[in-house]
Design a protein with these regions (language model features):
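C-terminal single-pass membrane-anchor helix
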Residues: 102-131
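Structure-specific nucleic-acid interaction/processing domains
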Residues: 2-15, 21-105
């Protein structure tokens, strides 16, 4: 069993395509702990999708196919030039592995700070109400 997976941003752009012969959980965990991609990529992910394949070879071929189809900005250019001289039926559906950000919501680095400010203001208002 193997998987081809993709990272999708909040604008529904495919920003990275990869494959793994491991479980999806293990591979995604590796991305977020020992990630080889720029931090900007990981911060841009809204959703992770995957397709399950019968063999690692199938997953590798489909990785190259999808990189050439989507031209993700965080894939290395060496795989984007690979050409497949075979007919591929692109009929399998992507399944959602994990939703990280909801679509159509703008996430900013300051969101964490704003959240704490709002929590602080709410706590202050509650304390002021009871005093």
């Amino acid at each position: 069993m193997a998987y081809t997976y993709r990272f999708v941003d909040t604008n529904e752009n495919v920003i990275y395509v990869g494959y793994t012969g491991q479980t999806m959980a293990k591979r995604i965990s590796q991305h977020f702990t020992k990630g080889h991609l720029p931090k900007k990529c990981y911060k841009s992910i809204a959703r992770i999708d995957y397709i399950k394949w019968d063999s690692k070879s199938d997953a590798q071929v489909m990785e190259v196919y999808y990189i050439n189809k989507y031209h993700p900005k965080f894939n290395k250019l060496d795989k984007q030039g690979d050409r497949l001289n075979i007919q591929i039926e692109d009929e399998k559906e992507w399944e959602v592995y994990q939703v990280i950000k909801k679509p159509n919501i703008k996430y900013e680095a300051e969101d964490g700070i704003l959240t704490w400010i709002m929590i602080g203001a709410l706590v202050y208002a509650i304390i002021s109400f009871f005093i």
